[in-house]
Amino acid sequence: MTRNSQSLEVSLSLLDEFLSTLSTPFLSGSDLSHLDCEVLPKLHHLRVAASILRGYHIPATYTSLWRYLHHGYNHPVFRRSCPPDQEIVLHWAGRPDTPTISTENHNMLTREIPKFSFDIPAVAVPAKIEN
């Protein structure tokens, strides 16, 4: 997780701008590619872990980024392979370069029913699929 939120904002803004140029739901076309399988989990981890550990939320104004996540969240492969939010937070909280969580919060996360943040806070207009 980056320590510099301004750098993160610039990177997310550039990604949103790039995604706005696509006419397909995924980076290489109408279905998931290897590239999407690299990018989507990283964005999802950022969304979940940064929210809990740093209080950072991806701005709703990044509508193309949210649309991209929306397509990922609705793809069966992504949904089946995505870890629960609690596992993502515990993974990142255990790293030396991220904020730690209290023992009480750690124990609570391990006992909770698994949650999956697949909701979209912005309007995610589906991309037009070209044949």
Role assignments for model-derived ranges:
Residues S64, N74-G94, I101-H106:
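C-terminal transmembrane module of eukaryotic multi-pass membrane proteins
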Residues S7, L19, V39, I88, ...:
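Low-complexity, compositionally biased segments
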Residues A93, D97-N131:
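Eukaryotic N-terminal low-complexity, Ser/Thr- and Lys/Arg-rich leader segments
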Residues M1-P83, I129-E130:
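GST-like fold's C-terminal all-alpha helical module
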